């Protein structure tokens, strides 16, 4: 159901600048920049024009196509999650997949412990100090230790800069192998720790990039919801339990001025009241397609992190104590062999059981992905139609009033 709401304070003189911010929000600008510019268009903080602008932003974001630019990263996120969970499951000798946040925390602690105990030099301790204060969405150290710069840190920082700059973020799944570390990159620790350290750091890199992209996909939605909650505090009569519905009702009942009329716009109640964060979570929790699983296994095999069950690691539990680090190698000396799965349970892609050898003779084929955002909408209007209507609204001339 559509309802016509006024945009208080927006007339012919400032309609184009206001419209430009609405359009840019869905293409190049993030919410922080859009909010700052929109607030500058209104004379006071509690102006109803800013409340109406938030409603239009929510309608734009929930329209078909509004989130597709962010969901283009969905195949990459699914592959990162599968690769990270698969490596961690084999490292921990467990049959069920762990949460990506738990994997990042555990691998971060384990990585620091090995650097402290297996080397402990000034450079290693500097890296440990840097990682100690890192969150899952902060910039990683540019070097491992002993002055060795790594490609994975540059790749993660490049993706993070794209996210910070706002707009669309592009990342190829063929860059994921660059996140995988090899034992040869850790010659400064004893041989028995090199393979484990390479696996732990690989898990850490994959989880790092995964969380940065998750932040990119969900941040604008969370900030928009948070901003609406704070704006509602300035309107004492509006209920915080149904903020968007209350805002639409409040705006539609505002008295219109007879001189210098406001611009008006039709928005969908269903779009405005949609639970976008839940929609994003459902998209991210979809089963991993078979093509992505095959590509992920090829990445793991090329990196040497898929091996026979008898050669699995025996890493300590989460939040391990320091004494366990010096008890000896956690990696067996068996040869690394690539295995594949003849029977895949698509509903639970993490339960992959090795069944035989794979003879791989070339790069994996690029899978074709199609991402469709399922959002509730009782109309067939697309985002382009909405923006075209918005443009016509700004271009229309007003009647003369006495």
UniProtKB/Swiss-Prot annotation:
Main localization (coarse): virion
A Pfam family hit: DUF832
Cellular localization per UniProt: Virion tegument
Domain of life of the source: Viruses
InterPro entries attached to this UniProt entry: Herpesvirus_BRRF2-like (IPR008550)
Keywords, sorted A to Z: Virion, Virion tegument
GO cellular component terms, A-Z: viral tegument
Protein name, as recorded: Tegument protein ORF48
